[in-house]
């Protein structure tokens, strides 16, 4: 059986984080795509997690790299490659999780993340080719304390 994340389109790190920043606006995907096509950044920049991100530059990177950004917004995606800093930005854009407040970093490992099962699935879809999400502790609710670490790296 094929892992679901293997079927998703692959994006470069700058484009994937751009998509996550755009999605952090809370606007629906079709509206985001329309704003991007029109290069109308004001509605996005007033609502995104990182309003300092150069949207036009990221669109140019997506175009230059032939990254299928529209399909990624509509259907989901996975990163071609993502380093620990990118994982931390993903967690911030997607779930407003921050180091020292919501988790701790120890080398190439993030621990103490309180994640619901749908969050685990979404994160795994995007980074699962390179990173693994493992249980630190199980709680009685749908929330688990998790850690994200590089695959094949001993703890």
Residue spans for each PLM region:
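Structural boundary micro-motifs
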Residues: 1-155
